[in-house]
Amino acid sequence: MANIPLLLSLADDLGRMSMVPFYEPYYCQRQRNPYLALVGPMEQQLRQLEKQVGASSGSSGAVSKIGKDGFQVCMDVSHFKPSELVVKVQDNSVLVEGNHEEREDDHGFITRHFVRRYALPPGYEADKVASTLSSDGVLTIKVPKPPAIEDKGNERIVQIQQVGPAHLNVKENPKEAVEQDNGNDK
C-alpha cells in the first residue's frame, strides 16, 4: 500500500514522456508514445485502488486549519457511532480514535479502526480543546486562539503618590548618625 503514491507518480511521469518533438500537439504524442498503452490501464487501476483505500480508512476528508477563531479540525466519522469515538489530549497533541468491532454491511463484514494525531500550533492551550459531533457524522475539534501577548519588555508604570508640601533640597543625615552607621562610636 505504501507503494501506491510511488506508482502513481511513475504513471504520471511516463504519461508525460514523449519520443516526439515538443511542437507536435498533445494528441499526436499520445498516439506515438509506446508506453502509454501500458500506463493508461495501470493508472486507472491505481486510482481506483487509491479511492478504495481512502474511503475505507474511516476518517477520510479530515481538514485542519488555523483561522481567526483558532485551530479547528473537521473530519467525516459517519461510519462510527458516538460511543466508538474517543478524543483525547496528550502532551501538546489532540488524538482522535475510532474503533468498531466486526459488523455486516452491504459487501460482507467489516472492521474499522483509525487513529489521527494533530499537533497543536505553538501558543495554543491543550486544556481548551473542545469537540462536537454533528448528526450527519462530522466531528469538529476546536481550540480557541490564544490571547495576544503584548511585549512590553521590563517597562512598568510607577504610581505617583500625592503628599503635602515638599522642599526641593535633599535632607542630609546628622553627622552622628552617619558615624554610628559606619561603626565608629565616640
Curated annotation (Swiss-Prot):
Q: Which InterPro entries match?
A: A-crystallin/Hsp20_dom, Alpha-crystallin/sHSP_animal, HSP20-like_chaperone
Q: What is the lineage of its organism?
A: Eukaryota, Metazoa, Ecdysozoa, Arthropoda, Hexapoda
Alphabetical keyword list: Stress response
Q: Which family does it belong to?
A: Belongs to the small heat shock protein (HSP20) family.
What PANTHER family does the database record attribute to this sequence? HEAT SHOCK PROTEIN 22-RELATED (PTHR45640:SF13), HEAT SHOCK PROTEIN HSP-12.2-RELATED (PTHR45640)
Q: A GO molecular function for this record?
A: unfolded protein binding
Q: Which Gene3D superfamilies does UniProt cross-reference here?
A: 2.60.40.790
Quote the protein name from its UniProt record. Answer: Heat shock protein 23
Q: Which residues form the sHSP domain?
A: 53-161
Q: A GO biological process this protein is involved in? A: response to hypoxia
A GO cellular component annotation here is:
cytoplasm
Using the UniProt annotation, give all residue ranges assigned to the region (Disordered): 163-186
